[in-house]
Protein backbone atom coordinates (compact mmCIF):
# COMPACT_ATOMS: atom_id res chain seq x y z
CA UNK A 1 0.00 0.00 0.00
CA UNK A 2 2.95 2.33 0.58
CA UNK A 3 3.93 1.92 -3.08
CA UNK A 4 0.44 3.06 -4.10
CA UNK A 5 0.84 6.06 -1.79
CA UNK A 6 4.17 6.92 -3.44
CA UNK A 7 2.50 6.63 -6.83
CA UNK A 8 -0.16 9.06 -5.64
CA UNK A 9 2.37 11.53 -4.21
CA UNK A 10 4.53 11.56 -7.35
CA UNK A 11 1.53 11.78 -9.68
CA UNK A 12 -0.03 14.57 -7.63
CA UNK A 13 3.26 16.49 -7.49
CA UNK A 14 3.64 16.36 -11.27
CA UNK A 15 -0.01 17.31 -11.77
CA UNK A 16 0.25 20.32 -9.45
CA UNK A 17 3.48 21.45 -11.14
CA UNK A 18 1.81 21.20 -14.56
CA UNK A 19 -1.24 23.16 -13.39
CA UNK A 20 0.96 25.94 -12.00
CA UNK A 21 3.07 25.98 -15.19
CA UNK A 22 0.00 26.09 -17.42
CA UNK A 23 -1.60 28.87 -15.39
CA UNK A 24 1.60 30.91 -15.74
CA UNK A 25 1.70 30.11 -19.47
CA UNK A 26 -1.76 31.56 -20.06
CA UNK A 27 -1.61 34.96 -21.75
CA UNK A 28 -4.22 37.46 -22.84
CA UNK A 29 -3.47 37.07 -26.54
CA UNK A 30 -5.65 39.96 -27.72
CA UNK A 31 -3.89 42.37 -25.39
CA UNK A 32 -0.48 40.99 -26.41
CA UNK A 33 -1.31 41.32 -30.11
CA UNK A 34 -2.38 44.92 -29.59
CA UNK A 35 0.85 45.73 -27.72
CA UNK A 36 2.91 44.10 -30.46
CA UNK A 37 1.05 45.96 -33.19
CA UNK A 38 1.47 49.29 -31.39
CA UNK A 39 5.17 48.59 -30.81
CA UNK A 40 5.61 47.51 -34.44
CA UNK A 41 3.98 50.70 -35.72
CA UNK A 42 6.10 52.93 -33.51
CA UNK A 43 9.45 51.12 -33.40
CA UNK A 44 9.45 48.33 -35.95
CA UNK A 45 10.29 44.67 -35.45
CA UNK A 46 12.84 45.33 -32.69
CA UNK A 47 10.26 47.11 -30.53
CA UNK A 48 7.75 44.31 -31.15
CA UNK A 49 10.37 41.70 -30.22
CA UNK A 50 11.06 43.61 -27.01
CA UNK A 51 7.37 43.35 -26.07
CA UNK A 52 7.55 39.58 -26.68
CA UNK A 53 10.77 39.28 -24.69
CA UNK A 54 9.12 40.99 -21.71
CA UNK A 55 5.98 38.83 -21.82
CA UNK A 56 5.89 35.30 -20.43
CA UNK A 57 4.13 32.38 -22.03
CA UNK A 58 4.29 30.28 -25.17
CA UNK A 59 2.40 32.77 -27.35
CA UNK A 60 4.98 35.49 -26.71
CA UNK A 61 7.80 33.02 -27.38
CA UNK A 62 6.24 31.99 -30.69
CA UNK A 63 5.73 35.61 -31.68
CA UNK A 64 9.34 36.39 -30.83
CA UNK A 65 10.58 33.58 -33.07
CA UNK A 66 8.43 34.83 -35.94
CA UNK A 67 9.44 38.46 -35.51
CA UNK A 68 13.09 37.44 -35.30
CA UNK A 69 12.86 36.10 -38.88
CA UNK A 70 10.83 39.01 -40.27
CA UNK A 71 13.64 40.18 -42.58
CA UNK A 72 13.46 36.84 -44.42
CA UNK A 73 9.85 37.30 -45.51
CA UNK A 74 6.39 36.28 -44.44
CA UNK A 75 6.76 32.66 -45.54
CA UNK A 76 9.79 32.17 -43.30
CA UNK A 77 7.99 33.92 -40.44
CA UNK A 78 5.03 31.59 -40.87
CA UNK A 79 7.23 28.47 -40.94
CA UNK A 80 9.15 29.69 -37.90
CA UNK A 81 5.92 30.30 -35.98
CA UNK A 82 4.60 26.83 -36.87
CA UNK A 83 7.87 25.09 -35.98
CA UNK A 84 8.30 26.88 -32.68
CA UNK A 85 4.63 26.29 -31.90
CA UNK A 86 5.36 22.56 -31.98
CA UNK A 87 8.27 23.07 -29.57
CA UNK A 88 6.05 25.04 -27.20
CA UNK A 89 3.35 22.38 -27.40
CA UNK A 90 5.92 19.78 -26.36
CA UNK A 91 6.84 21.91 -23.36
CA UNK A 92 3.17 22.21 -22.38
CA UNK A 93 2.73 18.41 -22.54
CA UNK A 94 5.89 17.67 -20.57
CA UNK A 95 5.28 15.25 -17.69
CA UNK A 96 1.90 14.00 -18.91
CA UNK A 97 3.28 10.56 -19.74
CA UNK A 98 4.30 10.15 -16.09
CA UNK A 99 0.82 11.02 -14.85
CA UNK A 100 -0.62 8.57 -17.36
CA UNK A 101 1.78 5.89 -16.11
CA UNK A 102 0.75 6.47 -12.49
CA UNK A 103 -2.93 6.29 -13.49
CA UNK A 104 -2.27 2.91 -15.11
CA UNK A 105 -0.13 1.33 -12.39
CA UNK A 106 -2.11 2.43 -9.31
CA UNK A 107 -4.98 -0.05 -9.89
CA UNK A 108 -2.49 -2.75 -10.86
CA UNK A 109 -0.66 -2.23 -7.59
CA UNK A 110 -4.02 -2.43 -5.84
CA UNK A 111 -4.78 -5.73 -7.55
CA UNK A 112 -1.31 -6.94 -6.57
CA UNK A 113 -2.27 -6.14 -2.98
CA UNK A 114 -5.43 -8.19 -3.51
CA UNK A 115 -3.40 -11.21 -4.56
CA UNK A 116 -0.99 -10.77 -1.64
CA UNK A 117 -3.92 -10.44 0.78
CA UNK A 118 -5.51 -13.62 -0.52
CA UNK A 119 -2.21 -15.49 -0.26
CA UNK A 120 -1.89 -14.32 3.35
CA UNK A 121 -5.44 -15.48 4.07
CA UNK A 122 -4.74 -18.95 2.65
CA UNK A 123 -1.44 -19.13 4.56
CA UNK A 124 -3.29 -18.32 7.78
CA UNK A 125 -5.89 -21.00 7.02
CA UNK A 126 -3.14 -23.52 6.29
CA UNK A 127 -1.29 -22.75 9.54
CA UNK A 128 -4.46 -22.88 11.64
CA UNK A 129 -5.56 -26.14 10.12
CA UNK A 130 -9.20 -25.14 9.91
CA UNK A 131 -11.28 -22.51 8.13
CA UNK A 132 -12.18 -19.72 10.51
CA UNK A 133 -14.14 -16.71 9.28
CA UNK A 134 -11.78 -14.41 11.20
CA UNK A 135 -8.72 -15.77 9.39
CA UNK A 136 -10.30 -15.38 5.95
CA UNK A 137 -11.76 -11.94 6.75
CA UNK A 138 -8.35 -10.46 7.64
CA UNK A 139 -6.83 -11.42 4.30
CA UNK A 140 -9.85 -10.32 2.32
CA UNK A 141 -9.86 -6.99 4.16
CA UNK A 142 -6.23 -6.33 3.13
CA UNK A 143 -7.12 -7.30 -0.43
CA UNK A 144 -10.10 -4.98 -0.62
CA UNK A 145 -8.34 -2.02 1.00
CA UNK A 146 -5.40 -2.13 -1.42
CA UNK A 147 -7.70 -2.49 -4.42
CA UNK A 148 -9.84 0.40 -3.20
CA UNK A 149 -6.81 2.61 -2.57
CA UNK A 150 -5.36 1.85 -6.02
CA UNK A 151 -8.65 2.72 -7.70
CA UNK A 152 -9.05 5.95 -5.69
CA UNK A 153 -5.52 7.05 -6.64
CA UNK A 154 -6.19 6.33 -10.33
CA UNK A 155 -9.51 8.21 -10.27
CA UNK A 156 -8.02 11.30 -8.61
CA UNK A 157 -5.03 11.38 -10.96
CA UNK A 158 -7.34 10.86 -13.96
CA UNK A 159 -9.33 13.95 -12.95
CA UNK A 160 -6.14 16.02 -12.76
CA UNK A 161 -4.91 14.56 -16.06
CA UNK A 162 -8.13 15.48 -17.88
CA UNK A 163 -8.07 19.00 -16.42
CA UNK A 164 -4.46 19.44 -17.57
CA UNK A 165 -5.31 18.17 -21.07
CA UNK A 166 -8.21 20.61 -21.36
CA UNK A 167 -5.97 23.46 -20.19
CA UNK A 168 -3.32 22.50 -22.78
CA UNK A 169 -5.98 22.33 -25.52
CA UNK A 170 -7.19 25.80 -24.57
CA UNK A 171 -3.66 27.24 -24.68
CA UNK A 172 -2.89 25.54 -28.01
CA UNK A 173 -6.08 26.90 -29.59
CA UNK A 174 -5.14 30.40 -28.40
CA UNK A 175 -1.59 29.90 -29.74
CA UNK A 176 -2.87 28.89 -33.17
CA UNK A 177 -5.43 31.69 -33.33
CA UNK A 178 -2.91 34.29 -32.18
CA UNK A 179 -0.31 33.04 -34.67
CA UNK A 180 -2.76 33.53 -37.53
CA UNK A 181 -3.52 37.01 -36.22
CA UNK A 182 0.20 37.85 -36.04
CA UNK A 183 0.77 36.76 -39.64
CA UNK A 184 -2.30 38.75 -40.75
CA UNK A 185 -1.03 41.80 -38.88
CA UNK A 186 2.40 41.56 -40.50
CA UNK A 187 0.88 41.17 -43.98
CA UNK A 188 -1.36 44.16 -43.26
CA UNK A 189 1.74 46.21 -42.44
CA UNK A 190 3.40 45.36 -45.71
CA UNK A 191 5.65 42.38 -44.97
CA UNK A 192 6.08 40.49 -48.23
CA UNK A 193 7.92 37.41 -49.39
Residue ranges and their predicted role:
Residues 3-10, 103-109, 113-116, 147, ...:
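Residue-level signal for the membrane-embedded core of alpha-helical transmembrane segments
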Amino acid sequence: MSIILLTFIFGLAIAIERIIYLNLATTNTEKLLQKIEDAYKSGGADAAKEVCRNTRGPVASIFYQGLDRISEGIDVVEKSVISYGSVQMGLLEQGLSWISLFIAIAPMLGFLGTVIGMIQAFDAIQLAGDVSPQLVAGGIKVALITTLFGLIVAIILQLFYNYILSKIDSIVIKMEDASISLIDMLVEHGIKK
